[in-house]
Regions:
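Conserved PDZ fold ligand-binding element
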Residues: 272-294
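PDZ/PDZ-like peptide-tail recognition elements
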Residues: 225-268, 303, 324-325
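Zymogen propeptides
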Residues: 2-24
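Short internal beta-strands
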Residues: 27-34, 205-208
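Solvent-exposed loop/turn segments at secondary-structure junctions
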Residues: 2-5, 34-38, 92-96, 182-185, ...
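PDZ-domain C-terminal substructure recognizer with occasional recognition of PDZ-binding tails
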Residues: 278, 284, 299-325
Length: 325
């Protein structure tokens, strides 16, 4: 996938639905977006034991992943509806931070025990990452070793998560759809090769490619002269990312020690300013639903359409006031 492109996620959903129609409950989904410690909450989500707000809160969606949840909502809703297992693939942030800071060679023996088996010797993989640094990170060539280490950590960890599941009693003989960024599957040297090294299971890769017109430009990642490999088994052409307008109140919030959400700043000419909100107001609920954190407010607003209204209850100097916004 291209994380922020809705068209890529529509491709994923289409493939998921087709697989479900053909294979029923013998499929499972793996998602880069979740780190392995949050697996219990994915299980609870699929089982229908927690609602969406609780699910997003417990998996720390906004701080852990950060992309718009509504890009992924249809996939996760379908998994819940059909009881399709969703497997958390990614490495915990603490491990990533540790390797990013010290590199693999700078870790103690105790620290290395927390990691999967990691192979950083693929020269084509390294060439791809070096190009990414050169094109996207100004004057960062000195960080190539650590960047290579972190990328391999992510991919080895996700590969190990996939193999762990497919080797388990519940994952045995299942068809597995792994949803991850294009950079982790292109040319096979990321997740695909690392899964195969561990399991020798057959696989296909599908690369959703963004470009204008009928043909990609020659400098596209799919056609790198320094990497004489097939970029993917299938390339699915999708339209380029289109910036979408977001529904917003127009406030900057801060969560205080007593868990109250206090307005720190109001955007000029925003819905909040027009409604009469003031800096220092405390937002307590929206349409009767308690707002416990910024993610609650953001995700609720994304359910709205342009032209809709909502009732926001605020607290000002000990008095509760309701505004129609």
């Amino acid at each position: 996938e291209t994380h922020a492109n809705k068209a890529a996620h529509q491709v994923q959903l289409k493939i998921l639905k087709t697989y479900y129609e053909k294979f029923g409950n013998t499929i499972a989904i793996g998602m880069e977006m979740f780190t392995r410690p949050y697996q219990p909450f994915l299980d609870q989500w699929v089982a229908g034991e927690i609602d969406e707000n609780k699910f997003l809160e417990e998996t720390h969606w906004d701080s852990e992943w950060g992309y718009d949840y509504y890009l992924y909502k249809d996939i996760l809703d379908f998994a819940r509806e059909k009881k399709i297992p969703v497997i958390a693939l990614n490495a915990p942030k603490a491990l990533v931070k540790m390797v990013s800071k010290n590199g693999l060679k700078g870790l103690s023996e105790e620290e290395k025990k927390q990691l999967p088996e990691i192979d950083t010797t693929d020269n084509f993989h390294r060439a791809y990452l070096e190009r990414a640094i050169r094109e996207h990170m100004v004057d960062r060539t000195a960080d190539l070793e650590k960047y290579n280490d972190v990328q391999n950590l992510w991919e080895e960890y996700m590969a190990q998560s996939i193999v762990n599941y497919l080797s388990s009693w519940e994952g045995k003989d299942k068809k597995f759809l792994a949803f991850a960024g294009n950079g982790h599957i292109i040319y096979d040297f990321g997740i695909p090769e690392k899964v195969f090294r561990r399991s020798h299971l057959p696989y296909y890769t599908i690369y959703p490619a963004e470009f204008h017109g009928d043909k990609p430009p020659p400098e596209h990642d799919l056609f790198l002269p320094e990497i004489p490999l097939e970029p993917a088994d299938f390339v699915w052409v999708i339209p380029p990312l289109v910036e979408q307008k977001r529904i917003y109140l127009g406030v900057q919030l801060q969560k205080k020690s007593d868990n109250k959400l206090v307005i720190q700043e109001i955007t000029p000419k925003s819905p909040a300013e027009k409604a009469g909100f003031l800096v220092g107001d405390i937002i307590s609920s929206i349409d009767g639903t308690a707002v416990k954190g910024v993610p609650d407010l953001v995700h609720y607003l994304q359910k709205k359409k342009f032209g809709d209204t909502c009732i926001v209850e605020i607290e000002r100097d000990g008095t509760k006031i309701s505004y129609s916004v």
